[in-house]
């Protein structure tokens, strides 16, 4: 049995499979998604960790430092911002906090700290990401800046996604791969 299908075989098998009410999650489907390594600005010390995370290039961010991303939305209204980080445990007994700021708004603080072997901890470890969600009641159409800041040590950011369909279920973020 061959390990790879040729184009004709792929076409044949795809024509036989039907997925009703299922549409692919794409960048143009009301989402903007990026790998953390695709930043537009950083305050210093950010290190790309190759082969780590869903992105395979997660970013270790020192305490007090931040990454910023400039985006342009073609929609306005309710949205959610999902931020995915590598699930880690503080080795100093502290917390694992980071903040997210949209434009000049108030920073929203999240904690990744989970009780060892709790359901949240298990889900994060099995997924390979700890995903935190920020509800946005009215994001406007146009240009915005998303800033993610490490408030504690051991913060490793993997990906983020802004989604104008807050109820959407997903597993992977529809990012365009970076060559960085």
Model-derived features with residue positions:
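Extracytoplasmic
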Residues: 1-180
């Amino acid at each position: 049995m061959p390990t790879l299908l040729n184009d004709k075989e792929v076409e044949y098998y795809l024509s036989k499979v039907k997925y009703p009410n299922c549409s692919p999650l794409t960048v143009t489907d009301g989402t903007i998604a990026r790998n953390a390594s695709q930043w537009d600005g950083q305050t210093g010390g950010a290190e790309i960790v190759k082969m780590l995370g869903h992105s395979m290039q997660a970013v270790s961010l020192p305490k007090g430092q931040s990454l910023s991303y400039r985006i342009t939305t073609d929609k306005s209204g309710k949205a959610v911002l999902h931020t995915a980080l590598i699930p880690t445990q503080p080795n100093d007994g502290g917390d694992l906090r980071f903040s997210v700021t949209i434009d000049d708004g108030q920073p929203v603080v999240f904690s990744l700290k989970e009780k060892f072997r709790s359901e949240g901890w298990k889900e994060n470890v099995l997924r390979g990401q700890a995903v935190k969600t920020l509800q946005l009641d009215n994001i406007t159409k146009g240009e915005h800046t998303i800033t993610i800041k490490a408030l504690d040590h051991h913060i490793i950011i993997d990906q983020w996604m802004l989604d104008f369909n807050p109820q959407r279920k997903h597993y992977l973020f529809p990012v365009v791969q970076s060559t960085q």
